[in-house]
Amino acid sequence: MNQGKIITVSGPLVVASGMQEANIQDICRVGHLGLVGEIIEMRRDQASIQVYEETSGIGPGEPVVTTGCPLSVELGPGLISEMFDGIQRPLDRFQKATDSDFLIRGVAIPSLDRKAKWAFIPKLSVGQEVVAGDILGTVQETAVIEHRIMVPYKVSGTLVAIHAGDFTVTDTVYEIKQEDGSIYQGSLMQTWPVRQSRPVAQKLIPVEPLVTGQRVIDTFFPVTKGGAAAVPGPFGAGKTVVQHQIAKFANVDIVIYVGCGERGNEMTDVLNEFPELIDPNTGQSIMERTVLIANTSNMPVAAREASIYTGITIAEYFRDMGYSVAIMADSTSRWAEALREMSGRLQEMPGDEGYPAYLGSRIAEYYERAGRVRTLGSQEREGTITAIGAVSPPGGDISEPVTQNTLRIIKVFWGLDAPLAQRRHFPAINWLTSYSLYQDDVGSYIDRKQESNWSNKVTRAMAILQREASLEEIVRLVGLDSLSEQDRLTMAVARQIREDYLQQNAFDSVDTFTSFPKQEAMLTNILTFNEEASKALSLGAYFNEIMEGTAQVRDRIARSKFIPEENLEQIKGLTQKVTKEIHHVLAKGGI
């Protein structure tokens, strides 16, 4: 522990002298109020400290005391369904303790509730050899999440005591005799520094798709469990709604939602909606698997920078249990702006658009903590973290540094388009500019698992949309009637794909989520119509006759998005009806 005194205060940056025994990344208590801060630069005996609370009212001469510990999070039962701020202060208990709707400075409240008791069920017995990562026992944290208590990193030896029963997170639950003869006394809780990634046994290639229930994503631009994706787009294009939809319906075990510098109303929406929504995979409330980290735009800027790391560290903890985790960061641009502000106050040499030169490496550090891994421990298990970050480029200009540095790292780009959003086409993901480098892996995985030709259908559908884009300029110049019959069919089918398949209403109880079997049935119907109509044209039928003769079945295809999942056979039955009606047009002899 080292005590110095403040010599400079500049917004969230405080400079203290007499800190020669302090270390970089140490947590400090700043001023008489004891504000939480972190040392980010050392020069001789002077330490530059970024303070995670409002610094108004503190001045030179006030004390600064280091704790000797880096910024860490508490990991244990009580994380799920909880809402924290950027440095893991529990907002609900904070409000009750301070009787204030705003964060009172200098108040220290433990991240995990010290009074709550959890029923611990041992899985190992006394005398067994254990290594770091082994699961000692479980706590049923919510109806859907079994919290697995693991041996902490760098601890191994013989289990000499383990107790069943109800315990708080600080009670001693087990004892391990280590190789040096010392006894390690463990509780249900462990801590971990947020800027250090948790170790794994092996990194694996991600192949299993993350099913989001959003048709444009799952069909054309899938992300794998363990992948990394970015959602850049201008204001009002629907970034937050896309993130909310994935948080609600993705087929993962745990969701970590980080609201980083965005509007407080959006976090309020999450708090209001999530408890009422039912997870289609478990039948329980979505809050039963969700951790919320709220660092809204009116909270201290420095804490934004920490909130992303807090979220990914909690995600790694659940991954190490063997769970699949999705972390949503909304928005990484606000996080980068916090980096820029602190860099400016430190008088560092600016890079592009004033961002620090190390912006790219910081973004890479975050996304590289995602992935599919084999975890530590003698019991073999796999876990995944899927990182999905929203990016808010000013004016929708994706050539700005945050977007460009993000695109170098991630493998899935869901580019939101302002013209699509203005036409009320949501999700406004542009199918011509977006991409997924997992497309081939996911396609092969689905073809193998489903024994279908899914990847071929996706390729055909995308070819139709690309052909439509190439014909659009001709149509604008000389009109639709100037096109050949085949090209007019392509334009009609492309419109069907856009309006009846890609367009999705997030606020409709049925259309908000589409399972993979339903997606395949819907796409098959549209492609069958294209195939059969194309054959009919080659046999001499007229385009207008085909469109008139199939008007009823095309209308049913358009409405199939509103057919509930349990009536899937109704959608599948439309394939035969399409073929039958086109054959009927040919039989009438429209040649």
UniProtKB/Swiss-Prot annotation:
It catalyses: ATP + H2O + 4 H(+)(in) = ADP + phosphate + 5 H(+)(out). Keywords: ATP synthesis, ATP-binding, Hydrogen ion transport, Ion transport, Nucleotide-binding, Translocase, Transport. One of its GO terms (biological process) is proton motive force-driven plasma membrane ATP synthesis. InterPro entries: ATP-synt_VA_C (IPR055190), ATP-synth_a_Xtn (IPR031686), ATP_synth_asu-like_sf (IPR023366), ATPase_a/bsu_AS (IPR020003), ATPase_F1/V1/A1_a/bsu_N (IPR004100), ATPase_F1/V1/A1_a/bsu_N_sf (IPR036121), ATPase_F1/V1/A1_a/bsu_nucl-bd (IPR000194), ATPase_F1/V1_b/a_C (IPR024034). Signal peptide: none annotated. ATP binds at G233, P234, F235, G236, A237, G238, K239, T240. Its EC number is 7.1.2.2. One of its GO terms (cellular component) is proton-transporting ATP synthase complex. It is an enzyme of class 7 (translocase). One of its GO terms (molecular function) is proton-transporting ATP synthase activity, rotational mechanism. Belongs to the ATPase alpha/beta chains family. HAMAP family: ATP_synth_A_arch. Produces ATP from ADP in the presence of a proton gradient across the membrane. The V-type alpha chain is a catalytic subunit. This is V-type ATP synthase alpha chain. It comes from Streptococcus pyogenes serotype M3 (strain ATCC BAA-595 / MGAS315).
